[in-house]
Amino acid sequence: MTIISTLRRFIPPYKWYVVLNLFFNIVSTILSLFSFATLIPVLQLLFGLATIDGVYTPLEQVQGLEELLVALKNNFYFMLQSQMELRGPSYVLLLLGIGLVVLTGLKCLTIWLANYFMVPLRTGVLRDLRESLYKKVVSLPIGFFTEERKGDVMSRMTNDVNEVEASIMSTLDMLFKDPVMILIYLVTLFCVSWQLTLFVLLLLPVAGLLIGRIGRTLKRASTKGQEQNAEILTQIEETLGGLRVVKAFNAEQKLIHRFQLLINATRRTFNRINRRYYLAHPVSEFLGTTLIAILLWFGGLLILSDNSAIDAATFIYYIVIFYSIIGPAKDLSKATYGIRRGMASLERIDKILETESNVIEAKTPKQVVDFQSMIRFENVSFAYQTDRPVLQDVNLDIHKGQTVALVGQSGSGKTTMADLLPRFYDPQSGCITIDGVDIREVKTHDLRALMGNVNQEAILFNDTFYNNITFGVEHATMEQVRQAARIANADDFIMATPDQYETTIGDRGSRLSGGQRQRISIARAILKNPPILILDEATSALDTESEKLVQEALENLMRDRTTIVVAHRLSTVRNADLICVLHEGRIVERGTHDELMAQNGYYRRLVEMQEK
C-alpha cells in the first residue's frame, strides 16, 4: 500500500479543503520568496556588493514568462533607484524593512489559513475511518469473532486508529505543504542559477536512499509493535473478564509474570521504533548542512574565479533559498517516517475493513413481513472447521405455534442449530426455509425482525433499565416496558432501585445478580413481541422461585407463538410440543416427553441422569 493510494481512499470528500490548503501554501511560499528577494538590495546597499541599477520596462511590452520576471526585477530596482536619488539610501532601507514586515505578515496569515483548512480534513478523515471500522465490525458475522481474538479487534479499533491519527493525520499538512514549498523553491533556484541547482540535484539521491532505508525498517518494526499492543489488550480483557477465576485459583502472580513479559517485549520494540523515528530530524539536518557546505565551496569557487553567472548578493540569496528547503525537507522526512508507522497500523485496520462476510445478502431479497405457517430445516449440515462437523443432515419441521425443544449433551449442536435460524451463520449444505422461502433470500434485517432471542448469558449494556429493555424496539411506552418487566418477574426489583427504570445497571449489568440480568434480557424479548422466540438456556441463571415465576410467564408468552428452546435442564421443556434429541450433530430422537420416555433411548437416559 502506497501513501498515494491511502490518500485517494480518504481525501475525496474533502477535496475542496485540500485545494484551499494547497492554494494558501503556494501563496505563502511565493511571499517567502519575495521577502527573501528584499535581502539582495539590502546587501547591496549595506555592503556595496553592487550598484542598484534598473531600467523601467512597461509590462505591456513584455512577452513570455522569462521577460516578465526580468521586467519585474528591473522595475523594482528602478523604483529603488528613484527613491535613493530623491530621499537617500536610509529611506530605501526603511522602505525595504517595512516591505519585509508586510510580506512576512501576509505570509503568516496565509500559513494560518492553510492550517485552518487542514483541520476539518484531518478530523473528518479520522471520523470516517472510525465510522467505517465500527460499521464493518457491527456488520461482520458472529463467525468472524470466533476466529479472531476480541482483544486484537479492540486494539485495531483503538490503538491502531490512534496511531493513524498520531502519525498520518498529524502529518497531512506537511505532506501537502512541504512538496509544494520544495518544488517552488527548486524552480526558483533553477531560475537564479541552473548550474548550481544541477550540481545540488546530483547529490540528493544519496540522501534519499539513506532516509528511505530507515523508513522501511521503521514500518516493519511498527507492525510488530501494534501486534504486541493487541496482545496486551487481549490479556487485559481476559483478566478483567475472568477476574473471579483468577482470584479463586490464586493465579495473580502467574498473570502478572505473563503481563510483564508482554510489556517488556513491547517496550523493547517501541524503543527501536522511536529511536529510528527520531533519526529523521538529525539525519535530514546533517545531510542538508553538508549540502550547504558543499554548495558554499563550489559556488564560492565560481564567484572568486569570475566564472559565475551570478554576483555575490544573488549567491547569498541563492543560499538563503536553498537553506529554506532544509526545513520543509526535514518536515517531509519526518512526515514520511510517521506515515510509515501509520501505514503499519492502517494495514492492520484494513484486514478488518476488507474482510468479506460469509453471510451474504441476496441481491434481490424477497419480502417477508410475518411468519405464517412453518420453519423447515432441510438436510442442514454445518461445521465451524471443515474437518469437524457440528450438524449433519438435520431435517426438522417447526409449525407455527409449536414449542420445539432442542436437548442433548454439550457439543451436540443445539445452540448452533438455533444460531442458524437468524443467520448468525449459514449452513455449508442444505437450507432453512420460512414459509417456503429460503432464509438466504430474505433480507437479514427483516428475518431477524421476526425473532426474539434470549441467550444463556444475558447481554446487557451500561445503560438504564429502560434503555436495556427497549434495546432494538422504538417508540415503546413506559407502560409497555413495565408490562414486559412484570411478565419477566423484573418489575419489583427495578422499582426498588433509587431511580427505578432510569437506574444505570453498570457494565454488562454488573450491579445486578445473575437472575436479575436474565430477567431483564427476557423482558427485552417479551417487549419485542416477535412471532418466533429463540430461548437458549433462558432460565438457567434463575433461582428456583424466580425460575418458576418466569417459566409460567414464558409459557403464557409462548402460547400461540412459535418457540425454539435450547435446554440442558430437561424439567423446563416437558410441556414442549416436540422435543428433539441431538447427538453428535444429528437428531436421533424426536417426540413429546412421554413418547420419548417410552422409547427408553437417549432422552430417557438424560432425564434419569439429571434426576439422580
Regions found by a protein language model. Give the residues of each.
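Membrane-integrated ABC transporters
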Residues: 1-39, 45-100, 106, 114-118, ...
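ABC-type nucleotide-binding domain
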Residues: 361-362, 368-612
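Juxtamembrane helix-loop junctions of ABC transporter transmembrane domains
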Residues: 32-40, 48-51, 94, 99-150, ...
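An intracellular "coupling" helix at the cytosolic face of ABC transporter transmembrane type-1 domains
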Residues: 12-15, 142-143, 159-168, 172, ...
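Hydrophobic/aromatic residues within transmembrane alpha-helices of membrane transport systems
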Residues: 43, 102, 133, 137, ...
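Hydrophobic alpha-helical transmembrane bundles that constitute the permease/transmembrane domains
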Residues: 26-34, 101-112, 164-167, 171-183, ...
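Transmembrane helices of ABC transporter permease
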Residues: 17-27, 173-224, 297-310, 327
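Helix-loop-helix
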Residues: 188-202, 276-346
